[in-house]
């Protein structure tokens, strides 16, 4: 067990932490978290979050506290410190998934479940981003794991205490952090016919977790309670004011975001039902239904269900992989997948040399190590295909897993840093500002960007109407996005002169100063 767990921690640690600070913080969520942590430290107010100098009432401060702790440990509040809490939460959640897999099946099931969690697209991406959803998912997963272990050992006191992580989930993102694990555990107790014995500990644990979380709300004040609880949670859930999607939104999002493991998911769900793997099945169904009934929908909301999906998939692979490789039609499907794995690196190399220069210039001019990465992926895909032909079950699974792990490594070691420094980094806008960052009051018009605030290092004013600065006689700098403001160019250039133009993503940004500035 120790060997498999150590291997899993090393693999997931590399996937989540390698090059973690090599890319800039991307709008909109990442820099927002870092700004709140920095403003807390600058103000010395660790209770009330601020964003761009204004009280931020939408989320509690726990993730900001974690960023501050990481910044203290590393010595500076930078990209690594901002993302480290999310990466650590992801790593711990992989460990929890492994431990649950061992309890529900065996070490092999635990190891496969952990790898499934670490290598699906959504989880791997979010593990490397400064987003509170990963720590939110961790605390939910920790509560469910501790409750399950307590039930196995028939420990009512530890069962009640298992809900304490729900308090930190509340302080990370909201009341759903307690509602979800309590709901999952409650339904699980009904199915296991143990509700009568554990109902009181469940209630007491819920009260204790709520009391712990309430301390911050009492200290923060009525405005935070009113905005956060009533508007950001109750109203958003029942009568959404943003992120409004169709009832089928989560079905296609889950399929694409859990790739490549979503290919096995229908069989894994059926297998979990047939073999009565109740905990992960109820865990997933409860979370899916909870957010499906919400009027506000985002793909990342389902992140707390991913450990359950990984468990069901890992258990299914443990139970069915040999049959999948041995049986004719499933072996053919796996060979098709292996063929796709081979075509991906080959197609990438062809695309780099065939597509128009404007579309692939970043890769043509990038490091030549691209061809090394793609060659390794080609060999892994080929190995997967050959072992399927030879019906070598364990070797085929090893090649399959290696392909996915190395794809994740390629994503963090090559792809993301290259895309960041050529088109996605907000430093492409802020670095050319030079001394303007220090000497001028800065405004933006036509766009909002928390990233610009973070990299400038001070609050900026985001204009809704260009008339707002007509009365401001100070020495100012105005940053505008070119396309949305084309119709205002004549008006702008009556009072301002363009001093620099920079490219960010697919648009141009123009820096204006006053004609007498």
What are these regions (language model features)?
Residues 1-329, 351, 500-501, 505-508:
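Membrane-integral, polyisoprenol-dependent glycosyltransferases
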Residues 160, 271-517:
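Membrane-embedded architecture of ER/inner-membrane glycosylation machinery
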């Amino acid at each position: 067990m120790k060997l498999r767990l150590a291997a899993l921690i090393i693999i997931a640690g590399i996937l989540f932490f390698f090059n973690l600070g090599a890319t800039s913080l991307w709008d909109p969520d990442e820099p927002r978290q870092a700004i709140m942590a920095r403003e807390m430290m600058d103000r010395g107010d660790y209770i009330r979050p601020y964003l761009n100098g204004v009280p931020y009432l939408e989320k509690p401060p726990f993730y900001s506290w974690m960023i501050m702790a990481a910044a203290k440990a590393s010595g500076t509040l930078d990209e690594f410190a901002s993302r480290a809490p999310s990466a650590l939460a992801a790593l711990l959640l992989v460990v929890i998934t492994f431990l649950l897999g061992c309890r529900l099946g065996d070490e092999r099931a635990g190891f496969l479940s952990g790898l499934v969690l670490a290598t699906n697209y959504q989880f791997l991406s979010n593990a490397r981003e400064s987003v509170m959803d990963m720590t939110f998912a961790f605390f939910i997963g920790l509560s469910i794991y501790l409750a399950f272990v307590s039930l196995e050992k028939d420990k009512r006191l530890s069962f009640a205490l298992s809900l304490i992580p729900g308090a930190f989930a509340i302080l990370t993102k909201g009341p759903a952090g307690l509602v979800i694990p309590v709901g999952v555990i409650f339904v699980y107790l009904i199915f296991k016919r143990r509700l009568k014995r554990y109902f009181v500990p469940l209630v007491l644990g819920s009260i204790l977790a709520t009391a712990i979380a309430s301390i911050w709300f009492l200290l923060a004040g009525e405005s935070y309670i009113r905005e956060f609880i009533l508007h950001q949670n109750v109203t958003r859930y029942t009568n959404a004011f943003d992120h409004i999607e169709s009832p089928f939104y989560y079905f296609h999002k889950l399929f694409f975001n859990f790739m490549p493991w979503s290919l096995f998911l229908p069989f894994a769900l059926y297998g979990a039902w047939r073999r009565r793997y109740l905990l992960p099945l109820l865990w997933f169904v409860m979370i899916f239904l909870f957010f499906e009934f919400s009027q506000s929908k985002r793909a990342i909301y389902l992140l707390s269900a991913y450990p359950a999906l990984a468990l069901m998939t890992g258990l299914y692979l443990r139970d069915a992989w040999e049959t999948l490789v041995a049986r004719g039609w499933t072996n053919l499907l796996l060979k098709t997948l292996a063929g796709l794995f081979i075509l991906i690196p080959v197609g990438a190399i062809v695309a780099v040399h065939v597509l128009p220069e404007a579309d692939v210039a970043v890769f043509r001019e990038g490091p030549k190590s691209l061809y090394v990465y793609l060659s390794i992926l080609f060999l892994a895909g080929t190995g997967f295909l050959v072992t399927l032909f030879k019906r070598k079950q364990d070797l085929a699974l090893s090649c399959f897993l290696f392909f996915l792990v190395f794809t994740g490594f390629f994503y963090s070691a090559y792809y993301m840093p290259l895309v960041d420094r050529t088109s996605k980094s907000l430093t492409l806008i802020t670095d050319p500002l030079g001394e303007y960052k220090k000497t001028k009051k800065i405004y933006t018009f036509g766009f909002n960007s928390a990233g610009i605030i973070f990299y400038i290092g001070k609050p900026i004013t985001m204009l809704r109407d260009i008339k707002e600065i007509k009365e401001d006689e100070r020495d100012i700098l105005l940053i505008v996005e070119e396309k949305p403001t084309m119709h205002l160019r004549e008006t702008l250039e009556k009072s301002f002169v363009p001093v620099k133009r920079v490219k960010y993503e697919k648009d141009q940004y123009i820096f204006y100063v006053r004609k007498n500035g």
